[in-house]
A protein has these predicted regions:
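Active-site neighborhoods and metal-handling regions in enzymes and metal-associated proteins
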Residues: 1-116
């Protein structure tokens, strides 16, 4: 489920001593680059939509060194951490296939790639 994905991200991030932004999430990918479903970077296992064959999602954890809270600057676009801590954004696009998840954005030489 999407809850399984979010719970796994949250566990890895928080176990490392960081926090996950909750207001910004990943998304489905299809004819438009940003589609349903929303893919939160936190959650509870077993909850949320099922990951069905053919689904393509962008998993986009935004990880803060400090607390998880954010704020938007006066320009209405720029988002910063509320406590001024550093933050990083990661992204992979994943397809749900009959054989399991396939990371579409993995490059040769990336950790966990078949070439490794």
């Amino acid at each position: 489920t999407l809850g399984d994905v979010g719970a796994a991200i949250q566990a890895v991030v928080e176990d490392a001593g960081y926090s996950v932004i909750r207001e910004l999430v990943g998304h489905g990918v299809g004819f438009a680059p940003h589609e349903e479903p929303h893919v939160p970077n936190f959650g509870r296992r077993g909850q949320g939509a099922e990951l069905e064959e053919g689904l393509v999602i962008a998993i986009e954890p935004m990880v803060n060194v400090g607390r998880r809270h954010i704020r938007t600057l006066a320009d209405g676009w720029t988002v910063v951490t509320a406590d001024g801590s550093l933050s990083a954004h990661f992204e992979h696009t994943v397809a749900v296939t009959p054989e399991g998840p396939r990371i579409l954005t993995r490059r040769s030489g990336d950790r966990g790639s078949k070439e490794e």
